[in-house]
């Protein structure tokens, strides 16, 4: 079946399934409508005489009235709320049970007796809110005892839109966390940065810990979002230092869903499904065929013999399509005696908006939590597996489609079946090898597939010692195994086989295999003891982790003959750790935390191998003081102060401190006599390379007002990173290569983070919640090398190709600051082609670095924010999520790479141009001018979701929810390109994220 036909078949099949459910519901509703009037009449006759007006007053333990307390007749939807004086009136029957609840207080139930005496109900403060535990490194801590900057996010099942990857659930949700979503390719992971990252070219990804297993900082797209119970984001050093050498960029702890722990043994099932339709809603503005012919005649420098074609082809329309997708998840949760369990499976099939792009994922997970020896031994077993089948496409196809001549056809036949029926550039000598290939042929002829198998699991033992139950011994054994098998094949005679390095039409088969093994062992003891008003929670442990990989790749022709030498690589890394933490609190009012971790990494030499990472933090629960005891406005107020050090050991090479050698490939061997000899090339190295060390100061406030109807956090931090790791050029002859990874400088960062949660409305039928966060971050490089001046900088921000660097790291500037030529303009504001303002103010045509200037503008966003709101009425709900950034800049490299020269190039082919080129009238590509540097400010409405829930369909356990959502609704921005939300700030060949419409079903039974 054709791909489009198959997609529509899947879509129709899902629609039929959903319609079946709706038909079943409709039948049930008809039956209910027939029966309910009769039941209502009987009930009214039997109960009307017993209905009485129940009056009451709700107050707290100090006698103050509670506003907005919910009073509900148990088992019904009949209820009311208390007024500003704490009073309420409700009609109820004798023996009805009233359920009284209020945020921040323990609920209470009362039976209606028929007495005329008004009820006086006193609700006690809910201390369990303080006793709620949050997950931290190597353990848990009471929420009220937290001294560091962390936030736990639980996925909102009613307001999440379409979440294909795990990081989608965090976008715009946490202050200080900036997530740039991946490209429009399905399954592409986003870039996560906590507090902008603490390094330059070393790894800036946060450490990801899944159920106690620190995983490699690769994409977490293999994790099923439906299996995730919570994310805990650790931001300051007091909570991240326990992870030592990998925590400079923050930590994200992912906890997956577990089995029932409430004693319910009967299994419960949950099924969710959705169908999606997506499309690109914005294309690059290029010339149509008729407009192109006019521009070509006016501006192209082509010989008279060169003729345009007769076609009218919109090449962007030819490569894009409507993308269909579906997602199914089924889970079973229950308990067998003392063993809670959860089993789940999930399947995702998502087409990309580029033709032939498809992503499929199969997930399965098993979680067991048995207890033995009178619950003294707790065992937690988690196994997660996934198989990903990705059919990727080259994003260069987008640029090729934008620039391909619109007067040329998509298909054309040539002698000898050259081109396999697709149009290609030809001259009298045959195919033009310097021309770009037909983008449609690349999409339809290429056979690309990336298959990834991954399993993450662990077994954690928690033994509470008999007779000394305050002491627990913990053992955690975990693994993260991954296998990749990729291939990229192109048949003989394909147009792509006549361009670039492939010039004779020979087919190509590229194969890549990669194995990764990450194993760990953690053993630690935990001592928890309450001494009247004093509480101690102490932990000490040992950790061992091994990282190993082995890969090889080959490139052959279609007959299996090697076109290049096979390449092999294998390496391993060890991490050895000792760590400890002490939490102390007095009256749950004054808290102190101290941690220390020592890490040894085999990445470094024995002289610099060990790193020591301490931290200390204190907190004060101000609202528990006597002077706030009678305050009815402040319900929570805690001050936090912390200091700590963390490290960075994630550099490019496993053996950067050693002198290593690489065997030459076949094409680089030497002939001595009659025999070819393999040579060995030395690699660059730095024997003195050492840890990057980051120290952070943090001051924070946790607040809550009006029974926590208003709550949130405020944090301010200052951070300094010493011995920055960066890849730099070195003087010729000083090392075996011209670039090495080494310690070159320091960087200072600071920021303000504000989070707020509001419940403006909460009544019997209505509830409106709102959450928002705002972040201000700034980073400045304070030391870069032994000599720091304007001429000493590190180039970065490569736009592609040799020497096309658009950004620099420089002392006194934000990382990734643009370093460009200052464009000259005429008196009408029109840019002068090839004219720039030199540093002395004169006009120059030279594009040398000496004429470039530090713009003071960076791709790093100093300000970003997120907004989320949900409105519910009875069983209806409406949710909206959005996020945005401002203060950063984007270089429109797509526009900078367009000029009149492209109309007819030196390679003898014609190319299309952007409409903006007619405005600036540049005759050549001007890829280093600040004319194309634009503000990237934007606000994106991520999703709008509306749903309806049907409770108690055929029993109390059964519910059904239908929802409709729009993902990537719109982006408000003044940027002229497709999308300003780019991690590196350089807009080139982007695969834009589609606008997606989703119909979803959730069934619980």
PLM feature spans:
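C-terminal extracellular loops and terminal segments
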Residues: 153, 167-173, 739-748, 790-818, ...
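Detector for glycine-centered tight turns/loop "hinges" at secondary-structure junctions
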Residues: 63, 86, 416, 429-430, ...
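Extracellular/periplasmic, surface-exposed regions of secreted and cell-surface proteins
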Residues: 158, 204-205, 323-326, 360-362, ...
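Conserved small-residue
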Residues: 270-310, 655-656, 742, 761-859, ...
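Short aromatic-centered micro-motifs
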Residues: 71, 100, 208, 584, ...
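Glycine-rich, aromatic-lined ligand/substrate-binding cores of catalytic
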Residues: 858-891
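Short, small/polar-rich motifs associated with maturation and membrane association
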Residues: 2, 8-386, 394, 426, ...
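Extracytoplasmic gating/loop element in the C-terminal half of outer-membrane beta-barrel translocons
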Residues: 316, 440, 601, 883-967
């Amino acid at each position: 079946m054709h791909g489009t036909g198959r997609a529509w078949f899947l879509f129709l099949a899902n629609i039929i399934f959903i319609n079946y459910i709706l038909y079943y519901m409709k039948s049930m509703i008809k039956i209910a409508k027939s029966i309910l009037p009769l039941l209502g009449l009987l009930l009214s006759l039997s109960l009307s005489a017993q209905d009485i007006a129940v009056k009451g007053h709700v107050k707290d333990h100090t006698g103050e009235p509670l506003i907005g307390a919910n009073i509900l007749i148990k088992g019904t939807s009949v209820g009311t709320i208390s007024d500003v004086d704490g009073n309420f009136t409700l009609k109820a029957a004798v023996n009805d049970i009233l359920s009284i609840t209020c945020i921040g207080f323990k609920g209470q139930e009362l039976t209606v007796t028929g007495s005329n005496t008004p009820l006086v109900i006193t609700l006690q403060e809910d201390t369990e809110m303080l006793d709620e535990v949050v997950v931290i490194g190597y353990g848990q801590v009471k929420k009220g005892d937290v001294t560091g900057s962390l936030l736990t996010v639980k996925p909102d099942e009613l307001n999440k839109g379409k979440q294909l990857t795990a990081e989608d659930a965090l976008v715009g949700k946490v202050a200080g966390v900036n997530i740039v979503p991946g490209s429009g390719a399905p399954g592409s992971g986003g870039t996560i940065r906590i507090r902008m990252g603490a390094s330059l070219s070393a790894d800036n990804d946060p450490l990801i810990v899944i159920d106690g297993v620190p995983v490699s900082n690769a994409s977490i797209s293999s994790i099923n979002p439906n299996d995730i119970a919570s994310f805990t984001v650790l931001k300051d050093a007091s909570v991240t230092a326990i992870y030592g050498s990998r925590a400079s960029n923050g930590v994200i702890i992912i906890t997956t869903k577990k089995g029932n722990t409430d004693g319910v043994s009967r299994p419960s099932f949950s099924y969710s499904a959705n169908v999606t339709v997506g499309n690109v809603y914005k294309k690059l503005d290029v010339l149509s065929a008729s407009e192109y012919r006019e521009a070509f005649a006016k501006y192209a420098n082509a010989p008279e013999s060169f003729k345009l074609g007769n076609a009218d082809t919109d090449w962007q329309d030819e490569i894009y399509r409507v993308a269909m997708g579906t997602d199914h998840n089924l889970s079973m949760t229950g308990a067998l005696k003392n063993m809670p369990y959860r089993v789940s499976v999930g399947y995702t099939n998502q087409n990309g908006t580029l033709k032939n792009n498809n992503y499929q994922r199969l997930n399965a997970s098993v979680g067991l939590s048995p207890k033995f020896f009178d619950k003294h031994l707790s065992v937690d077993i988690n196994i997660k597996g996934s198989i990903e089948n990705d059919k990727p496409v080259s994003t260069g196809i987008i640029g090729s489609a934008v620039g391909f001549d619109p007067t040329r056809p998509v298909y054309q036949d040539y002698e000898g079946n050259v081109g396999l029926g697709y149009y290609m550039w030809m001259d009298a000598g045959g195919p033009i090898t310097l021309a770009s290939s037909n983008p449609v042929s690349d999409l339809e002829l290429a056979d690309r597939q990336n298959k990834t198998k991954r399993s993450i699991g662990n077994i954690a033992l928690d033994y509470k010692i008999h007779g000394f139950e305050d002491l627990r011994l913990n053992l955690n054994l975990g693994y993260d195994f991954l296998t990749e098998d990729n291939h990229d094949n192109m048949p003989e005679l394909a147009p792509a086989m006549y361009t670039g390095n492939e010039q004779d039409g020979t087919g190509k088969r590229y194969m890549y295999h990669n194995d990764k093994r990450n194993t760990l062992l953690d053993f630690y003891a935990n001592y928890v003891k309450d001494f009247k008003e004093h509480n101690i929670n102490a932990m000490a442990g040992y950790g061992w982790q091994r990282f190993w990989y082995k890969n090889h790749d080959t490139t052959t022709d279609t007959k299996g003959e090697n076109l290049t030498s096979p390449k092999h690589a294998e390496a391993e890394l060890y991490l050895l750790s000792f760590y400890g933490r002490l939490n102390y609190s007095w009256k749950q009012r004054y808290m102190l935390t101290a941690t220390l971790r020592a890490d040894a990494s085999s990445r470094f030499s024995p002289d610099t191998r060990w790193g020591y990472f301490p931290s200390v933090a204190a907190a004060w629960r101000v609202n528990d003081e006597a002077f706030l005891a009678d305050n009815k406005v402040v319900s929570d107020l805690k001050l936090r102060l912390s200091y700590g050090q963390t490290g960075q050991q994630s550099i490019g090479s496993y053996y950067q401190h050693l002198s290593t050698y690489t065997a030459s490939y076949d094409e680089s061997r030497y002939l001595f006599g009659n025999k070819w000899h393999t040579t060995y090339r030395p690699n660059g190295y730095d024997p003195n390379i050492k840890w990057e060390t980051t120290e952070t100061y943090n001051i924070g406030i946790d607040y809550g007002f009006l029974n926590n109807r208003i709550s949130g956090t405020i944090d301010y931090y200052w951070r300094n990173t010493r011995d920055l790791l960066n890849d730099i050029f070195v003087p010729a002859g000083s090392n075996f290569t011209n670039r090495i990874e080494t310690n070159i400088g320091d960087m200072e960062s600071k920021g303000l983070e504000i989070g707020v949660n509001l419940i403006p409305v909460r009544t019997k039928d209505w509830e409106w919640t709102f959450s928002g966060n705002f972040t201000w971050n700034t980073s400045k490089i304070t030391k870069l090398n032994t000599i720091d001046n304007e001429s000493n900088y590190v180039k970065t921000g490569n736009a592609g190709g040799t020497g096309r660097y658009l950004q620099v790291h420089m002392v006194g500037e934000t990382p990734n600051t643009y370093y460009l030529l200052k464009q000259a303009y005429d008196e009408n504001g029109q840019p002068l082609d090839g004219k720039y303002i030199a540093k002395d103010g004169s006009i120059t045509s030279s594009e040398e670095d000496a004429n470039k200037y530090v713009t003071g503008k960076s791709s790093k966003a100093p300000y970003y924010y997120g907004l989320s709101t949900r409105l519910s009425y009875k069983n209806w709900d409406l949710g909206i999520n959005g996020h945005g950034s401002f203060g950063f800049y984007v270089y429109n490299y797509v526009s900078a790479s367009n000029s009149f020269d492209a109309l007819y190039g030196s390679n003898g082919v014609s190319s299309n141009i952007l409409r903006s080129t007619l405005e600036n009238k540049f005759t050549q590509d001007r890829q280093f001018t600040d004319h194309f540097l634009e503000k990237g400010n934007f606000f994106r409405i991520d999703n709008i979701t509306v749903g309806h829930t049907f409770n108690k369909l055929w029993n109390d356990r059964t519910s059904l929810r239908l929802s409709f959502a729009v993902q990537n609704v719109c982006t408000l921005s003044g940027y002229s390109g497709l999308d300003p939300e780019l991690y590196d700030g350089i807009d080139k060949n982007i695969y834009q994220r589609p606008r997606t419409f989703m119909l979803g079903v959730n069934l619980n039974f």
